[in-house]
Amino acid sequence: MAKASETERSGPGTQPADAQTATSATVRPLSTQAVFRPDFGDEDNFPHPTLGPDTEPQDRMATTSRVRPPVRRLGGGLVEIPRAPDIDPLEALMTNPVVPESKRFCWNCGRPVGRSDSETKGASEGWCPYCGSPYSFLPQLNPGDIVAGQYEVKGCIAHGGLGWIYLALDRNVNGRPVVLKGLVHSGDAEAQAMAMAERQFLAEVVHPSIVQIFNFVEHTDRHGDPVGYIVMEYVGGQSLKRSKGQKLPVAEAIAYLLEILPALSYLHSIGLVYNDLKPENIMLTEEQLKLIDLGAVSRINSFGYLYGTPGFQAPEIVRTGPTVATDIYTVGRTLAALTLDLPTRNGRYVDGLPEDDPVLKTYDSYGRLLRRAIDPDPRQRFTTAEEMSAQLTGVLREVVAQDTGVPRPGLSTIFSPSRSTFGVDLLVAHTDVYLDGQVHAEKLTANEIVTALSVPLVDPTDVAASVLQATVLSQPVQTLDSLRAARHGALDADGVDFSESVELPLMEVRALLDLGDVAKATRKLDDLAERVGWRWRLVWYRAVAELLTGDYDSATKHFTEVLDTFPGELAPKLALAATAELAGNTDEHKFYQTVWSTNDGVISAAFGLARARSAEGDRVGAVRTLDEVPPTSRHFTTARLTSAVTLLSGRSTSEVTEEQIRDAARRVEALPPTEPRVLQIRALVLGGALDWLKDNKASTNHILGFPFTSHGLRLGVEASLRSLARVAPTQRHRYTLVDMANKVRPTSTF
């Protein structure tokens, strides 16, 4: 409805869905299309014009200026969007409404009509030489025409797949601008009558993000035939369609679709499917985004004329009819068209994704979301618009965090927060040998990971959900006791039959895994899967069991399956990162990075990322990651100590610089002396400095209160060891520390 570029005019439009791939050399234009299925009930699905937003200014209506902030925030406040200008409706009028010959096709058979040849100029109206149907590409309404005694036509604003679209003023409502669109092609009188009767349900569609239907009217054309028109709200602004080669930033595109998904959800809730989502059918106004062009809306599972746009329309629609899954497909294709360089063939977008597109390589979760949304198997797509919206929000948080460097944490609707941390003490723990004389492991264990990972939240629709909520935070043994009581009816006050519950046996599996009884948990999981199939929660616990048994390849496969299902979730990413680290796979870097950059409350990811970077030789990057742990975290001190150890440990003296030694010392010095591990890290830093000084020279400026000389550092190491000896847990270790202090002390001179 707003003014559009030449490129927009040449883009895909609404057409009947092809029942089979055309083999003819002639290609129909990419407008919204339909396929007719005469063997099914033919309700609610009739041709309609698409809003092709090509306009040129003519004259101007009076407008009232308003002061608005120059930007607004979408996507839950995560994305800043410039406000669209408020456009005068009359600026949308076309001064010369002509359909180019290249876009003239028969409305009935789809063959080219009205084309010029070497001898004659193409006629704007006539009869199709192939099927004999009448066609006309001339406007049926002219400026000044009064439709239904109420709507004064001002002119054409676009041409859709089934005719011209007009701007009119409602003389009964203070000259309010409206849009008139033909219901079906004017050459089909019977379809006109049916459309007027069948499309009345659209008037009941009321949603703030959907264009409002005001009326259905008829007007006699110049041949004396009645033509039905739908009268709709005029939506000023601009469509999301961009010129060829122009793409939106991923965050912006996601924010737009998050505004539209509630409208689709509303339609689905009242048994309708939109059918024709694409960038040109989403209008960005000064105040909001709106779906326009309801001509393709139909009832779920209805057949007849099924409208959509090739390249956006789900391939199975000719078999299944319109479904929620076919609408989900169009959301994925719309996102892809807005952000990716999609290849075209015969004037339409090719199915699938260009896997080498840099956007997909940059935003892994975004690519996973698109692949699920457009999965060729409709059963594998998001099941509802709400589910897709939740995952899209999670992906948006990742994208914005990656783009800005600022974490954007959010609560999951299907996973609990991490139950604890893992790997936080790994690097500093080996310095505990100073404290107790015991050698401490520096590797992750599967048990440590499993007890820390998030767990799937209880499905609120499960028959046992109300009982299970009380056991979520219980210890494993208590959980098993509660579940046994539930099975015997002790917790069932309402007489509910728990035999059909999926969550109750799943809670048992979780408790058994936490207790380390993997064999019994696996048997229960297999029994449950035999009854209900491998649902995603079962797949999650299967991966956990495989992680505990050391089957890292299978665990990775099944955690990945969960991630592909819910690409906006951080829980499977953290699980994959930890599994990869146990397996010695360098991929942990990628997933630890994603989790940490998105949510700086997942401390395990920070320490995991630091370990990964340190293993790659990137000590600077590892320390930088540890420095990102916020001071409000209870692991802040451990992060500072770990950064000091990272700077010095596991390296030869030739790899260490004086500045790195002093940096480690500053980190220790900044910590409170009451921190239990400060003494041992002081000893480590001073001892490392002493070893380094044997082969290098340094300034004599003090470090941790001692001169940076051999004599000064020996005094420092001695003092640290004697302090540790005073708090040693055993007499034997105390003597060991005192012996070490005596050996390192500088030689006394008299």
Curated annotation (Swiss-Prot):
Q: What class of enzyme is it?
A: transferase
The record's listing under InterPro entries reads: Kinase-like_dom_sf (IPR011009), PknG_rubred (IPR031634), PknG_TPR (IPR031636), Prot_kinase_dom (IPR000719), Ser/Thr_kinase_AS (IPR008271), TPR-like_helical_dom_sf (IPR011990)
Give a GO molecular function annotation for the protein.
protein serine kinase activity
Cell compartment(s), UniProt: Cytoplasm; Cell membrane
Q: Altering residue 92 to S: what's the impact?
A: Decreases inhibition by AX20017
Question: What Gene3D superfamilies does this protein's entry cite?
Answer: Phosphorylase Kinase, domain 1, Tetratricopeptide repeat domain, Transferase(Phosphotransferase) domain 1
TPR repeats by residue range: 536-569
Q: Name one Pfam family in it.
A: Pkinase
Skewed-composition ranges (Polar residues) = 17-34
Activity-regulation annotation: Kinase activity is regulated by the redox status of the environment via the rubredoxin domain. Autophosphorylation is not essential for kinase activity, but it promotes binding to GarA. The C-terminal domain also contributes to the regulation of activity. Inhibited by a specific small molecular-weight inhibitor, the tetrahydrobenzothiophene AX20017.
Catalyzed reactions per annotation: L-seryl-[protein] + ATP = O-phospho-L-seryl-[protein] + ADP + H(+); L-threonyl-[protein] + ATP = O-phospho-L-threonyl-[protein] + ADP + H(+)
- Record PTM Phosphothreonine, positions in chain: 63
Active site residues according to the UniProt entry:
276 (proton acceptor)
Deletion consequences = Disruption causes delayed mortality in mice. Mutant accumulates glutamate and glutamine.
* Cytoplasm as UniProt keyword: yes
- Keywords tagged on the record: Antibiotic resistance, ATP-binding, Cell membrane, Cytoplasm, Kinase, Membrane, Nucleotide-binding, Phosphoprotein, Serine/threonine-protein kinase, TPR repeat, Transferase, Virulence
Effect of altering residue 87 to S? Decreases inhibition by AX20017
Listed under GO cellular component are:
cytosol; plasma membrane
Mutagenesis / variant outcome for changing residue 309 to S: Decrease in activity
Describe the effect of residue 63 to A: Lack of phosphorylation. Does not affect kinase activity
The UniProt entry's sequence similarity note says:
Belongs to the protein kinase superfamily. Ser/Thr protein kinase family.
Q: What is known of its domains?
A: Contains an N-terminal rubredoxin domain, a central kinase domain and a C-terminal TPR domain.
Protein name per its UniProtKB record? Serine/threonine-protein kinase PknG
